[in-house]
Amino acid sequence: MFNEITKSVTWNGKVLELSTGKIARQADGAVTVKMGNSVLLCTAVVAKKAKEGIGFFPLTINYREMAYATGKIPGGFFKREGKASDREVLVSRLIDRPIRPLFHPAFVNETHVTCSVLSYDPETPVDILAIIGASAALSLSPAPYLEIVAASKVGLINGEFVLNPTLELLKTSQLDLVVAGTSDSVMMVESEAHLLAEEQMLEAVKFGFESFQPVIKIIKELAEEAKKPKLEMQDLYPASLKKEIEKLFVKEIEQAFAIKSKQERSTNLDLIPEKVLTHFVSDIENKKYSNYQIESALKSIESDILRNEILEKNRRIDGRSTTDIRQIACEIGLLPSAHGSALFTRGETQSLVSTTFGTSLDEQIVDSLEGEYKERFMLNYIFPPYSVNEAMPMKAPSRREVGHGKLAWRAINPILPNKVQFPYSIRVVAETTESNGSSSMATVCGSSLALMYAGVPIKAPVAGIAMGLVKEGKKFAVLSDILGDEDYFGDMDFKVAGTSEGITALQMDIKISGVDFKIMTVALEQARLGRLHILEQMNKVISKPNSELSKNAPSTTTIKIDKDKIRDIIGPGGKVIKEICETSGAKIDISDDGSVSVYASDRDKLKVALDKIKAIAVEPEIGEIFNGTVMKVLDSGAFINYLGNKDGFVHISEISEERIETVSSVLKQGDIVKVKLIGFDNKGKAKLTIKNADKDKSSNNPKPKNNVNNAKENSEPERRDSSKKRAWNEDSNNDKEEAITERKYFN
């Protein structure tokens, strides 16, 4: 019944198996990928008719993670998989980027690739398997897929490169890099790194590239045995058509490209296609040429003009040389109510960035195949239509926005302080207010500025730069800080972010074959110099984190209590903790280890909540002084309420140094008095005294007994007086039981 074909290879000590002919047999291409206990089904379907006139290749990649792959039922009301998660979007883009450039340029048939995770093994990288499976499925389909792609993941642990590291190993790795390519070229790189040198990054790419070559071999073997006839493709347009357009309109195109302003240049270029189509109207009616052929030939001429100017004259659209960076302007603190803000402008690309602090309750909950976890740092990239002067409605975040946001997240995440050093959750929102190339790298620069202005103790400022490439034969030019048109007509989009010491994120997309490691070496070094120049400009505005947080930032502190007291703070049905939150206006987060984090909008609210928690969780010591309230007056003494919910008795002899006739002559119900704990009776009731209590230092925050885990407190990060210009010190609070500081703007 089944004509199953299987190919396998031992890869990094595990068997990688590709098979076809058993599942999804009606799809143009279908491959089951197995490694360990991970199983993926990857399919490719090609539309029978071309979709001409759309101006782009209609390729859609969908990566899906099925809940049953880990033996789970999806949450939510409908109990089924729904909208793609950010993780699924990111892996879909990861598959798309190395594959898209490898189709015949004239191929415009709608093509759908679906990669479904059917069984999940945390010891295997399913994103890598998805790229391999998608490439294999396309190689079996009729699509004119010109070369076969494979991929690998590279980690760096204890100075050694590790192929396809497990999730557990990645936690200790200095590098998380995905590289994809063909048998002779790298096509795509995506990475997050902990301040690695350019040489290390290049070596990691080489290591990954060499590692996936055996995988390409078995995909080729599978394709040879099971492939279907490929669609026959013609040239995108006749060479004679291009020559005729060039003869008639090249001067006008060159004049338009000579305009430095993006808007004016685009306006002039947009007028040309209509003139060209009008000239060839009779040929279109006679079906000698199609609109799509004419527009494609025109685009090719535009590309030739731009590329020749760069390669032959070392001159770019805006007049810069290949290494020049556009003019940079930085501004901080322009949004008074935000916790931190910055405006970063580089030429005609601009990003408005804000930083907001939250509590651990504001952390993003992520439900993935690995299980549920919380993300403390969130970065949202927004690309509104007005940034490129388009009249379009605002929509939900696109795949591009999710991808650009994640790249910026990778660039910033390695330099953030840990939760002990900085207990807040952090959200950064970067809105691209103008765009003419490299908006994701403007996001990185703006985010670094906004975080420093907000007072986040980052390890070092971070900047990002987008590099381009124009290559004809053996001649090539690497471009620093590319424009939108240079990205569109160029051969590479190479984004590098990092500090002055090393790289934190790298993303590379190559549109052509033949980009070797020599070109990549030149690009990395040129990017390093550009990054240092941008950092120099940023440092003129702010070079280190402010020493104080915004006055709008929440105050926070963390205390450690006995685990047995957690239930008392929560109360039946959460009654007690709700009452504390409602009366104080604070937020409280309790961990299983007895850590209690309290967040409030100001110092007073924080203190109210903290006092209430201590009243429940902390036992007073003999000799401690408290403010107490007289609850009931008797002939023999008075009952006093102190430390929230605790009661004690003051005997008449302990009320005053002088003899008194009656208790009521000195104390009345509701009176506020200072009392000292002097012991406990045989029933465990507290014995208090008022005598001389007001002469001692009072405390409503007693030091807990040793049997309460010493109730150690870790205060919110203290900021020194900015006028003293003292540096951040993560250990500055170790000698303090409690430190709650008001936050003020840094001037």
From Swiss-Prot:
Residues annotated as binding Mg(2+): 487, 493
Question: Which residues lie in Low complexity bias regions?
Answer: 699-712
Q: Which residues form the signal peptide?
A: none
Q: Which cofactor does it need?
A: Mg(2+)
Q: Does the keyword RNA-binding apply?
A: yes
- Composition bias type Basic and acidic residues, residue spans: 727-747
Q: Which reaction does it catalyse?
A: RNA(n+1) + phosphate = RNA(n) + a ribonucleoside 5'-diphosphate
**What keywords is this UniProt entry annotated with?**
Cytoplasm, Magnesium, Metal-binding, Nucleotidyltransferase, RNA-binding, Transferase
A biological process term (GO) from this entry: mRNA catabolic process
Ranges for domain S1 motif come to 623-691
For this protein, the Enzyme Commission number is 2.7.7.8
Q: KH domain spans which residues? A: 554-613
Name the domain of life.
Bacteria
Q: Which SMART domains is this protein grouped with?
A: KH, S1
Give an example GO cellular component term for this record: cytosol
SUPFAM superfamilies assigned: Eukaryotic type KH-domain (KH-domain type I) (SSF54791), Nucleic acid-binding proteins (SSF50249), Polynucleotide phosphorylase/guanosine pentaphosphate synthase (PNPase/GPSI), domain 3 (SSF46915), Ribonuclease PH domain 2-like (SSF55666), Ribosomal protein S5 domain 2-like (SSF54211)
GO MF assignments: 3'-5'-RNA exonuclease activity; magnesium ion binding; polyribonucleotide nucleotidyltransferase activity; RNA binding
Q: What does this protein do?
A: Involved in mRNA degradation. Catalyzes the phosphorolysis of single-stranded polyribonucleotides processively in the 3'- to 5'-direction.
Q: Which family does it belong to?
A: Belongs to the polyribonucleotide nucleotidyltransferase family.
> Matching NCBIfam families, A to Z?
polynuc_phos, PRK11824.1
Its protein name is Polyribonucleotide nucleotidyltransferase
| Organism for this UniProt entry | Rickettsia felis (strain ATCC VR-1525 / URRWXCal2) (Rickettsia azadi)
Query: Which gene is annotated as encoding this protein in its UniProt record?
Result: pnp
